Each structure stands twice: as C-alpha cells, then as structure tokens.
Amino acid sequence: VEFEGMNQMVVPTLIDYLFKKVLRPSIVWPAFVYNYPKTMQPLARQNDENPTIVEQFQLVVNGWEIIKAYSELVDPMIQKANFDAQAKAREMWDEEATSGDDDFVLAMEYAMPPQSGFGMWIERTFSLLTGQENLRDVVLFPLMKSVKKDEPQS
C-alpha cells in the first residue's frame, strides 16, 4: 500500500493511518481489536507480559470505532518518558503527537490508583441500530451556525 505523504509519516502515525484507512473499513461484523503497539497510545498502561503492547481495545462494527477503552498508565517515570518521546515525534513533523504535560506528571508523582476508562460513540451506535449511513441523520445535538445580527432570520 502506498499513498501520498507516506514517507513523511513517523511509525505511529503510519500505523494509525493504515489501520483507519485500510483495515478498519473492512471490519463489518463486531470485532474487538486489541494488543495495540505501545507507541500508539502513550497514556495507556503497558501489558505486564509484553511491554511492547498496551492494555487497550476497540470495538469496531461496520468499519466504525464504537468503543475505545484502556487501562491508564499511572507510573510517572514511564509517562514522562512517553511524553518526551511524543515531543520528539512532534518535532519530526508528527501532527498527531501530543505535547507533554508536566503538571499531569507531577500529579502522578503524588500517586494515582489503578484506573481505566472507555469512550462510546453514541451517534455511531444509533446509526448502526437505525440503519443510517450518515452520522448527521442521528446527531442528538447538532451544532448550529451562528446567525449574524444583520442577517434576516427565517
């Protein structure tokens, strides 16, 4: 697979792009995707048996990410190293890389309990349940365009 801009991407961005544009659209039936490379999720906890992957999964249905969940990384030393790696990747033109957060790392140094979380796309779930192909047809609270004061309202 080749595409424009491929040679300028750093490895995590390339993996993410290939997953989203090549693999994920081919997943029709519900599937859990897990064993993500550590470089893909700097805020997730490393797997105890294999430190090259993180404790994360996604539920993918009909090519859409419905749920994303992971165990949170709570080790401040590892998190600082991850933020440093992200900063270096950002310098190498990786637009997806996050900048470090020293306040977050400082808070972690005071101790954080083990934790995890998940995000669920309600609109995508409604689209699947109602057979809609366009997310705009099921958005619960669509953004409204601002009306300028000098424009007539209908």
Identify the role of each PLM range:
Residues 1-66, 85-112, 151-154:
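Metal-assisted phosphate- and nucleotidyl-transfer catalytic regions
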Residues 72:
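Active-site environment of non-heme Fe oxygenases that use a 2-His-1-carboxylate facial triad
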